[in-house]
């Protein structure tokens, strides 16, 4: 009995059922970067059942009384799906993915001197990074995909001149250089 169950589980990892058409592409939107004023879309294409390429592009925009931002963010990942279970109406995939990213940003913010007078300071910088992500991709209703990932890597920022005294140069600062954690959620659909 155990042999039959383990063999059927291995067979389910490789083949999709007749009720679940095998789509090869996913269009995604980043729900987690939306909280940082970034609209990011991504395209994942499966090269074979165990490997895919994921390319993303996003725009930053924020305009408030004290701060203005505009930027472009791009990223490329090569995903290795190490565990896959495909059922008629859902599928689960665990993966790891090395990534490379670039983030160009123009910022403008107010800074105050000792007398309470403020002035606008502008800054433009480029950030490059790379690292490793680990994630779980869950597909349901034959078309909807939920992708949750975590990981980290390095980030190096060029041309950043921090003149704002309120920035503490943590991983949440756009001009940060160093080791960065990553955590995110993408929502998409198969086609």
Each predicted region: which residue ranges?
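Flexible, solvent-exposed loop segments that connect beta-strands
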Residues: 58-69, 102-126, 157-176
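Short loop/turn motifs that connect adjacent beta-strands in outer-membrane beta-barrel proteins
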Residues: 14-23, 49-50, 83-93, 140-146
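Cleavable N-terminal export/targeting peptides
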Residues: 1-20
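Outer-membrane beta-barrel "beta-signal"
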Residues: 75-80, 177-191
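Transmembrane beta-barrel outer-membrane domains
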Residues: 20-22, 32-36, 65-73, 89-91, ...
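Membrane-embedded beta-strands of outer-membrane beta-barrel proteins
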Residues: 41, 76, 96, 132-134, ...
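Transmembrane beta-strands of outer-membrane beta-barrel pores
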Residues: 33-35, 45, 57-63, 80-82, ...
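Transmembrane beta-strands of outer-membrane beta-barrel proteins
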Residues: 25-29, 53-55, 74, 92-98, ...
């Amino acid at each position: 009995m155990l042999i039959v169950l383990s063999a059927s589980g291995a067979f389910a990892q490789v083949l999709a059922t007749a009720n679940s058409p095998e789509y090869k592409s996913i269009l995604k939107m980043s729900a987690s970067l939306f909280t940082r004023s970034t609209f990011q879309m991504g395209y994942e294409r499966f090269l074979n059942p165990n490997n895919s390429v994921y390319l993303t592009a996003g725009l930053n925009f924020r305009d408030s009384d004290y701060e203005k931002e505009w930027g472009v963010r791009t990223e490329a990942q090569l995903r290795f799906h190490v565990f896959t279970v495909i059922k008629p109406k859902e599928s689960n995939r665990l993966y790891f993915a090395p990534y490379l990213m670039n983030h160009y940003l123009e910022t403008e913010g107010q800074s105050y001197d000792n007398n309470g007078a403020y002035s606008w300071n502008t800054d433009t910088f480029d950030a490059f990074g790379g690292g490793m992500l680990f994630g779980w991709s869950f597909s349901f209703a034959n078309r909807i995909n939920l992708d949750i990932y975590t990981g980290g890597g390095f980030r190096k920022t060029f041309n950043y001149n921090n003149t704002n005294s309120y920035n503490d140069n943590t991983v949440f600062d756009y001009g940060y250089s160093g080791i960065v954690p990553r955590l995110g959620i993408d929502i998409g659909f198969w086609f």
